[in-house]
Design a protein with these regions (language model features):
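Bacterial N-terminal signal peptides that target proteins for export
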Residues: 2-16
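Sterically constrained small-residue positions within well-ordered secondary structures
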Residues: 10, 20, 58-60, 80, ...
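Ubiquitous "structural anchor" signal
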Residues: 21, 105-106, 116, 263, ...
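Sec/Tat signal peptide C-region and signal peptidase I cleavage site
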Residues: 25-29
């Protein structure tokens, strides 16, 4: 890295540090899906909000009403149309239904072999069905396959009641979780996706939810690649046709109502890199399949995701004053990945802006500035710049010596 350009005076000031103009070439992302913390926050991925400007690569021509492509490792939105337009999710709603069931399983509030008594309400729910019988006892494992593989509304209501006592209470939990995940355009009324004027989302929110589901619950991802399921002697195929067309695709969920059109959230893993695509409002099953495959292929072929920094590779090494250590690494929480057009990773420009002088004591995780990453003059990502290790305060004489040195800096 280039040497730090110092603009500090003896009083606190701001210092903009230009890092190496050309980062070393970084191998394409290894299999390292971002890991959620105990709070459910995904570490190792930026919070997706708006896409970085990747317009150097023309977007594919799609017929969907709204669509999105997102890289799960970096958390970046690669491209989108109608990003924040409020749309009907139809059975894509069941992504959140399953998310909350997975959360209950992880917390021990449910077990896969636990049986659920099917209520009259669940049995009578209209639309696509698993064909469970009223008052029968069905395992959570079977109901999950009914929701994910068969898109059964009856199974969705049964699981909602198992988690929260009623579908209404479950919808409240869905909205609470949506708020935690930052789903700003989303409001749920039911667990199924049956039409309601207030049951709405956006392709951005569906992308964020899907990326969080894949990252937080990889142990349950196998349900989404299951091609068929038989219950009550009725075999039903998974409606996601991509599972038969592309063996890198391992999810996620279809949706359809007359008002929502044909919708599909899909995800594929190729060479350790995972992409999620969302298409809503297409004309038919073939169109949603074609649009999704086209979007996935375009995203993989035209972009790469590189790992820039982690705890062992700080973004910058900064001088510390009045501490037991003379220097400390500054970096990001978890690994930092960035998605860029193929062949452009060496042109990423990182700039660290942090408070100078840095005075001990410092604690690991203290925010001291911002790391900005840009390409061709356009900002792609901004991350908090954090202290990567504790720096205790020096003894009396060490502090006094540094105070004198600072007078001449």
């Amino acid at each position: 890295m280039t040497s730090i350009q110092k603009f500090a005076s003896p009083v606190l000031s701001r210092c903009v540090v230009a890092l190496a103009l050309a980062l070393p070439m970084v191998a394409q992302a290894q299999t390292q899906t971002p890991v959620p913390t105990e709070s459910g926050q995904v570490v190792g991925a930026q919070t997706p909000a708006l896409p970085g400007d990747l317009s150097v690569v023309p977007a594919p021509g799609l017929t969907a009403r709204a669509w999105l492509s997102m890289d799960v490792n970096s958390g970046q939105i690669i491209a989108a149309e109608g990003l924040n337009e409020r749309v009907e999710p139809a059975s894509l709603t069941k992504l959140m239904t399953a998310y909350l069931v997975f959360d209950a399983l992880e917390a021990g509030r449910l077990k896969l072999d636990q049986t659920v008594v099917i209520s009259d309400k669940a049995w009578r729910t209209e639309g696509s069905r698993m064909f469970v019988k009223v008052n029968s006892q069905v395992s959570v494992n079977d109901l999950l396959q009914g929701v994910i593989v068969q898109s059964g509304n009856d199974a969705s209501v049964a699981l909602a009641e198992a988690v929260a006592g009623s579908e209404g209470a479950f919808a409240a939990l869905m909205n609470e979780e949506a708020t935690k995940l930052g789903l700003t355009a989303t409001h749920f009324v039911n667990s199924t996706g049956l039409p309601d004027p207030e049951h709405l989302t956006s392709v951005r929110d569906l992308g964020v939810l899907s990326a969080a589901l894949v990252a937080r619950f990889p142990q349950y991802l196998h349900y989404y690649s299951q091609k068929e399921y038989t219950y009550n002697n009725i075999k039903q195929p998974n409606r996601n046709r991509l599972l038969w067309l592309d063996n890198t695709v391992d999810g996620l969920k279809t949706g359809h109502t007359q008002s929502a059109g044909y919708c599909l959230v899909s995800t594929a893993l190729r060479d350790g890199r995972r992409v999620v695509s969302v298409v809503v409002g297409t004309a038919n099953d073939a169109a949603r399949t074609e649009n999704s495959l086209k979007l996935l292929n375009w995203s993989f072929q035209n972009f790469e995701t590189v790992k820039l920094y982690d705890a062992s590779n700080p973004a910058v090494t900064a001088r510390v004053w009045e501490g037991e250590l003379e220097n400390v690494g500054l970096g990001t929480e978890g690994a930092l990945w960035l998605t860029v057009p193929r062949g452009k990773s060496a042109e990423i420009k990182p700039v660290a802006n942090y408070t100078q002088p840095l005075l001990a004591p410092l604690s690991k995780g203290d925010k001291v500035g911002t790391l900005t990453l840009s390409l061709d003059g356009k900002v792609l990502a901004e991350q908090p710049l954090l202290v990567l290790e504790d720096v205790p305060e020096a003894g009396f004489f060490g502090r006094m010596a540094d105070k004198v040195r600072l007078m001449f800096e």
